């Protein structure tokens, strides 16, 4: 029994970093990540088992974390979250484009705009000790969403602001930092950084880059301007 338990822990220890570092993610890989993480959490439980007081404190700590995550959300600070989102998006500049990727080792267009918000929301949840934001970060991480899905308001995360025949036709008065521009064919999405500047994980040069609006490339495509409800 001890040998099987040790092998299980070893498997979890190998699986967790591999699943985290792998650029591409699927529902199966995310489930595997959670299983490996929970498996590693059983190590301190096993070590504390012979000591009742230590075991009680450990179980109480786990219970406290679970209870805390169920507490009501605090009033959101959309400005702080938007600033954090823009900061996270910029950390991906020059990252390699990988279809289905969701981290700095490789990322695609929808992965970029979603993962930036996952990271920003998780960081703000810890900074503000907000269980509501923690739950939202987990939701954003768990449920994948393509560019097309984001343009259709998937799970109520986004809503439409306006439509335009291309980026140059967008009314600047309608733009807010953090807004998303989804091409109307649903193939691509970019995020607005401000000052006529957008960030995108571009499948053409196969990298993430920041550009000002020009009359070429994706900037000539018909678009739907979407806004994250979290940032309002």
Regions found by a protein language model. Name each.
Residues 222-232:
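Short, low-complexity, Pro/Ser/Thr/Gly-rich segments in the mature regions of secreted, periplasmic
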Residues 74-78, 127-207:
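...with weaker cross-activation on analogous glycine-rich loops/strands in unrelated enzymes
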Residues 2-43:
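Membrane-embedded alpha-helical segments of integral membrane proteins
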Residues 27, 49-50, 160:
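Short alpha-helical segments used as structural interaction elements across diverse proteins
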Residues 3, 43-52, 74-81, 91-94, ...:
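Generic structural signal for short, solvent-exposed loop/turn connectors between secondary structure elements
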Residues 24-37, 44-46, 94-107, 133-134, ...:
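Glycine-rich catalytic cores of cysteine/serine-nucleophile enzymes that process amide/ester linkages
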Residues 56-155:
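N-terminal capping segments
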Residues 32-62:
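Cytosolic-side transmembrane helix boundary signature
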């Amino acid at each position: 029994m001890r040998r099987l338990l040790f092998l299980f822990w070893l498997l979890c220890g190998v699986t967790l970093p591999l699943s985290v570092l792998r650029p591409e993610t699927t529902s199966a890989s995310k489930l595997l990540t959670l299983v490996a993480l929970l498996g590693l959490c059983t190590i301190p439980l096993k070590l504390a088992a012979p000591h009742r007081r230590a075991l009680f404190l450990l179980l109480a700590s786990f219970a406290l974390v679970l209870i805390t995550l169920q507490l009501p959300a605090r009033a959101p600070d959309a400005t702080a979250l938007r600033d954090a989102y823009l900061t996270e998006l910029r950390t991906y500049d020059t990252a390699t484009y990988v279809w289905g990727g969701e981290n700095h080792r490789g990322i695609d267009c929808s992965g970029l705009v979603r993962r930036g918000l996952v990271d920003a929301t998780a960081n703000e949840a810890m900074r503000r000790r907000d269980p509501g934001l923690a739950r939202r970060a987990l939701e954003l991480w768990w449920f994948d969403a393509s560019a097309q899905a984001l343009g259709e308001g998937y799970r109520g995360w986004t809503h439409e602001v306006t439509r335009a025949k291309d980026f140059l036709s967008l009314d600047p008065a309608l733009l807010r930092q953090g807004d998303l521009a989804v091409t109307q064919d649903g193939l691509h999405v970019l995020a607005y950084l401000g000052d006529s500047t957008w960030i995108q994980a571009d499948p053409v040069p196969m990298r993430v880059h920041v550009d000002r609006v020009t009359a070429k490339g994706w900037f000539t495509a018909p678009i739907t301007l979407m806004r994250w409800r979290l940032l309002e």
